[in-house]
Amino acid sequence: YVGCVGRSISDTMTPKWMHSKGFRKSLLYGLNIASDHIKKHQTVILVEGQGDVWRMHEAGYKGCVGIFGSSINEDQLILLEASGALNIVILTDEDDAGNKAFQQIIKKCGRRFNYLRPEISHKDVGDMTVDQINQELNHQIKGILYD
């Protein structure tokens, strides 16, 4: 049992995301789908939530996983190390929490990986269209994702 996740459709309701009792935030959302791509390209794209993962996969970025929020934990770090990734593309939200998450990820992961934080024009990659994602990210991360 991993758990169930629900999201409020109102931006004013808090918390926005609800997890079932016993939900395992120690996992990386989508790792089971992304693992072959991560191994092949030695690169993982790290985003905050499930919706971000869905949108990135929709845009063709198959090596994307979610951390279930704005911080990474030790269990998730172990999974990242075991994934075969040497590079982490960090696409946390463009807000205070996302900036703190970026710093926390770098601090926790240390020198184990190479890091890239692409610039995006929206607060959240999950709010972008597939065309916007491809327009803004292709030139920034293409070199580390494709031979």
Task: Give, region by region, the residue ranges found by the protein language model.
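Short, small/acidic-rich helices and loops at N termini and domain boundaries
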Residues: 36-40, 126-147
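Short, acidic/turn-prone active-site loops that include or flank metal/cofactor-
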Residues: 68-72, 93-96, 119-120
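Conserved beta-strand scaffold positions in the cores of enzyme catalytic domains, especially
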Residues: 64-66, 113-117
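Short, aromatic/basic amphipathic alpha-helical patches
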Residues: 100-110
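Acidic beta-strand-to-loop metal/phosphate-binding motif
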Residues: 46, 83-97
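A short acidic, often aromatic-flanked loop/helix-cap motif at beta-alpha or helix-coil junctions
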Residues: 119-127
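Phosphate-handling DNA/RNA-contact segment within nucleic-acid enzymes
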Residues: 1-83, 102
